[in-house]
C-alpha cells in the first residue's frame, strides 16, 4: 500500500525568492513572521490545523517566515513577540500582534471573506498600514510621548568576546585597559570554553559563509573572555562605540582601513579576528541571554525613555519593551498532584529558566487577597476553593517577553475555549475534568507580574565577595550559588585598591588586625557579586558556613568554606551579616546603580552620585596592591594574626 503523502500545514519562507513566489501566487497568506533565533509560534498550530480542515479553502495558505533573511520584513526584525501578517495578492491587509488565538481566527475568517469578494470584483483591496513600518517622524512622535512619562529604565549594554588566541597570548589585560580608556564600564567578565554546539548556535548568522567551519574551530580552540559592557549613565551608544573600537569584521580589511582598531592590532583575517561585538541592541540582548541568563543590566532614572540609535536609525530599545522579563506561573493543586513533572518539562522545552520556585499551602484569606480583583466574578469561589485545596507550586519564570510568551502557552482562561481553540495549549492539555477552573496561572502584564512576584517571593539582595585565595574556584562557587537558588544580578572582577578595601572594612579601622585584613583582601583579584534571593543575607551566610574551615568541615561539610577555604585567613568568601550592611557594601562596590530584584530601593537621591566607589580599579591602583608569593606565605603562617583576622571577620560578617 502506498504511503500517504504528508500534508504541509505551514510553508517555510526562508529566502527572499520563496517569499516573492508566495506573494505572487494570488493566495491569501497568513504568515507567522518570526526571528530565526526564537522560531515560530507553536502554541497556535493546533488552531491553524483545525481551521484548515474545517474551511478546506484553496485560497488560504499558512506560512512561517524568518524576518532575518527577508528584506520585505526588515521592519519586524528585533520584535520578539509573534507577528501574524495577512497578505492578499502580495499586499499586507491585516496584522495581529501576539499569540492571540481568537483574534487570529477572527482575522483569518474576515480577510478570507474579503479576498473572495475582491477576486469576484465586489470590493477593492485595502492595504493595511502597520505601525512597525511608520516613518521616522511618526516613531519620534510616539517616543516623545513615552519620554514625557519618564521612569526607571535599563542601561543599554553590548556583549564583547575576546577570542582564544588573544586569551592564550596574554593580551586580555591590554584590551581591558583600552576598554577603560574609552570610558566603557565592564559589568561582567567571565572566562568561557565554548562547545562546538554553543559556537554554532552563537554564530548561526554566519553559517552560510565559506569560513564558517574555520570560525567554529577557532572560537572553540581555547577559552574566551566574555564581557558585558556599558558606558555613562544610560549606556546609550555603547553598541556602536564598541564596534567602532574593534573595527571591520575582517581583520585584514581592518589593517588597511582602520589600523588603530583592535582587530587590526590583534587579529589576522575574517576567521581569526580577535574580538566580537554585538551588531545591534537587539542582538546584544540575545547574546546577553545566551551567555548570562541570570544577569540583569543596572537601571537608572531618566526623564526620557531609553530610546537608542542603532546604525544611525532610531528604534525602540529593550528597555522600552523589555525582551528579558520574568513572570509568575502557578500550578494549582489538582494539576500539581497529577501533572507536575509534565508541566515542568513543557516549561523547560519552551526555553524558560526557573529563577525561583516555592511550594506552599495558601490560606483562604491569602487566596482571596491574591485574587481580590476577581471577587465579583462567578468563578471567584471555585478559584479560591481550588487554590486552597492543597499545595500550589509558584514559579518565577525568566524568558524573552516572558509575560506574553507564558500566556500564549497557557491558552484561553476558559478551559472549554482552550480545548476548542488551542488544544495544544497547557490549559487544554493539563485540564482536570471535574475542576471548575483552569489549572495554571500566568500574570497578565509586566506590572502585574512584579506585584504578584513580590507577594510570593520576598527577595533581598546581598554582596558576595570571592576572595583572592579562592578566585581560581570562582566558577565552582558560582555554580554552587546558582544551585542554591541565588540569581547573580551583577558581577565584577576587581583587584581591590586599598581605598575600596578600607571602605568595605571601615568599621575595623584602628584595630590591631586591620592592616592584615586589608593586605589579604588586596593581595590578588576578587569577584564581587550582587546576589538576589529570598532572605538572601541569611541564606548566603548559612551556605558559607563557619569562618574556620576546620569547624566548617565538621559542622557544615556541604558549606562553601568547608569545600573551598584553605585557612582561617584564606576562607574563600565574605558577605555582610545584615541587610543594611549589604546595601551599604553594594553601594561601595557598584555605586548607586539600581539592580533588578531590588526590594530595598537602593536608588540614590537625585543629584547624589558616588563618583568613585563603583569604579573599576585602574592598573596603577592594582599595582599598589601587588604582593609577592613569599609575602602571602609569611602572612599565612602567622596563626596569631590569622586568629585576630578571623575574629574581626566574624564580627564584621
UniProtKB/Swiss-Prot annotation:
Region (NDK 3): 459-597
Ranges of Acidic residues composition bias in the record: 617-633
Transmembrane segments: none
SMART domains with a match to the protein in the record: NDK
CDD domains: NDPk_TX, TRX_NDPK
One Pfam family linked to the record: Thioredoxin
InterPro entries registered for this protein in UniProt: NDK-like_dom (IPR034907), NDK-like_dom_sf (IPR036850), Nucleoside_diP_kinase (IPR001564), Thioredoxin-like_sf (IPR036249), Thioredoxin_domain (IPR013766), TXND_domain-containing (IPR051766)
Region annotation (Disordered) ranges: 300-323, 603-653
Low complexity biased stretches: 301-310
Disulfide bridge partners, by residue number: 38-41
One BP annotation, GO: spermatogenesis
UniProt note on tissues of expression: Testis-specific.
Region (NDK 2): 324-459
Entry annotated with the keyword Disulfide bond: yes
Sequence segments annotated as region (NDK 1): 155-299
Residue ranges of every copy of the Thioredoxin domain listed in the record: 9-114
Entry protein name: Thioredoxin domain-containing protein 3 homolog
The species this protein was found in: Ciona intestinalis
Gene: CiIC3
Amino acid at each position: 500500500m502506498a504511503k500517504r503523502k504528508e500534508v504541509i500545514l505551514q510553508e517555510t519562507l526562508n529566502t527572499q525568492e520563496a517569499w516573492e513566489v508566495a506573494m505572487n501566487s494570488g493566495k491569501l497568506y497568513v504568515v507567522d513572521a518570526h526571528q530565526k533565533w526564537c522560531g515560530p509560534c507553536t502554541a497556535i498550530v493546533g488552531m491553524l490545523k483545525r481551521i484548515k480542515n474545517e474551511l478546506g479553502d484553496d485560497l488560504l495558505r499558512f506560512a512561517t517566515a524568518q524576518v532575518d533573511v527577508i528584506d520585505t520584513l526588515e521592519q519586524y526584525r528585533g520584535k520578539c513577540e509573534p507577528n501574524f501578517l495577512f497578505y492578499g495578492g502580495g499586499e499586507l491587509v491585516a496584522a495581529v500582534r501576539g499569540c492571540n488565538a481568537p483574534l487570529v481566527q477572527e482575522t483569518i475568517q474576515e480577510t478570507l471573506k474579503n479576498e473572495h469578494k475582491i477576486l469576484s470584483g465586489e470590493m477593492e483591496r485595502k492595504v493595511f498600514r502597520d505601525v512597525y513600518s511608520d516613518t521616522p517622524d511618526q516613531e519620534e512622535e510616539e517616543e516623545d510621548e513615552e519620554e514625557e512619562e519618564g521612569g526607571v529604565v535599563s542601561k543599554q549594554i553590548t556583549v564583547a568576546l575576546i577570542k582564544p588566541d588573544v586569551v592564550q597570548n596574554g593580551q586580555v589585560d591590554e584590551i581591558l585597559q583600552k576598554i577603560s580608556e574609552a570610558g566603557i564600564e565592564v559589568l561582567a567578565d567571565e572566562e568561557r570554553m565554548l562547545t562546538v554546539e554553543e559556537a554554532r548556535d552563537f554564530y548561526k548568522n554566519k553559517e552560510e559563509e565559506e569560513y564558517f567551519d574555520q570560525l567554529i574551530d577557532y572560537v572553540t580552540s581555547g577559552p574566551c573572555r566574555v564581557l558585558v559592557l556599558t558606558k555613562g549613565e544610560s549606556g546609550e551608544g555603547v553598541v556602536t562605540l564598541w564596534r567602532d573600537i574593534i573595527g571591520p569584521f575582517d581583520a585584514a580589511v581592518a589593517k588597511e582601513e582602520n589600523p588603530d582598531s583592535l582587530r587590526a592590532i590583534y587579529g589576522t583575517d575574517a576567521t581569526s579576528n580577535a574580538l566580537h561585538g554585538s551588531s545591534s541592541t537587539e542582538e546584544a540582548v540575545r547574546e546577553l541571554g545566551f551567555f548570562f541568563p541570570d544577569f540583569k543590566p543596572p537601571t537608572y532614572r531618566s526623564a526620557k525613555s531609553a530610546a537608542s540609535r542603532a546604525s544611525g536609525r532610531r528604534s525602540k530599545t529593550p528597555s522600552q519593551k523589555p525582551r528579558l522579563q520574568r513572570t509568575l506561573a502557578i500550578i494549582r493543586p489538582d494539576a500539581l498532584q497529577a501533572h507536575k513533572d509534565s508541566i515542568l518539562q513543557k516549561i523547560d522545552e519552551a526555553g524558560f529558566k526557573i529563577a525561583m520556585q516555592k511550594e506552599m499551602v495558601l490560606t483562604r484569606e491569602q487566596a482571596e487577597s491574591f485574587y481580590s480583583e476577581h471577587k465579583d466574578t462567578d468563578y471567584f469561589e471555585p478559584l479560591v476553593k481550588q487554590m486552597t485545596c492543597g499545595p500550589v507550586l509558584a514559579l518565577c519564570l525568566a524568558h524573552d517577553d516572558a509575560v506574553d510568551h507564558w500566556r500564549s502557552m497557557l491558552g484561553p482562561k476558559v478551559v472549554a475555549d482552550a480545548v476548542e481553540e488551542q488544544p495544544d495549549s497547557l490549559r487544554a492539555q493539563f485540564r482536570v475534568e471535574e475542576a471548575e477552573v483552569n489549572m495554571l496561572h500566568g500574570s497578565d502584564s509586566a506590572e502585574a507580574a512584579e506585584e504578584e512576584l513580590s507577594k510570593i517571593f520576598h527577595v533581598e539582595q546581598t554582596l558576595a565577595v570571592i576572595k583572592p585565595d579562592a578566585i581560581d574556584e570562582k566558577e565552582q562557587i558560582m555554580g554552587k550559588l546558582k544551585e542554591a537558588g541565588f540569581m547573580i544580578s551583577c558581577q565584577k572582577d576587581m583587584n581591590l585598591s586599598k581605598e575600596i578595601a578600607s571602605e568595605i572594612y571601615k568599621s575595623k579601622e584602628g584595630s590591631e588586625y586591620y592592616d592584615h585584613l586589608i593586605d589579604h583582601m588586596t593581595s590578588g583579584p576578587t569577584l564581587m557579586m550582587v546576589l538576589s534571593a529570598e532572605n538572601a543575607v541569611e541564606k548566603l551566610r548559612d551556605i558559607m558556613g563557619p569562618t574556620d574551615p576546620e569547624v566548617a568541615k565538621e559542622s557544615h561539610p556541604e558549606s562553601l568554606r568547608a569545600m573551598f577555604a584553605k585557612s582561617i585567613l584564606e576562607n574563600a568568601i565574605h558577605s555582610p551579616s545584615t541587610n543594611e550592611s549589604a546595601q551599604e557594601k553594594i553601594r561601595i562596590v557598584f555605586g548607586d546603580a539600581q539592580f533588578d530584584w531590588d526590594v530595598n530601593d537602593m536608588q540614590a537621591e537625585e543629584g547624589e552620585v558616588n563618583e568613585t566607589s563603583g569604579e573599576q580599579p585602574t592598573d596603577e591602583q592594582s599595582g599598589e596592591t601587588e604582593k609577592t608569593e613569599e609575602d602571602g606565605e609569611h602572612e599565612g603562617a602567622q596563626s596569631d594574626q590569622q586568629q585576630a583576622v578571623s575574629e574581626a571577620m566574624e564580627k564584621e560578617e
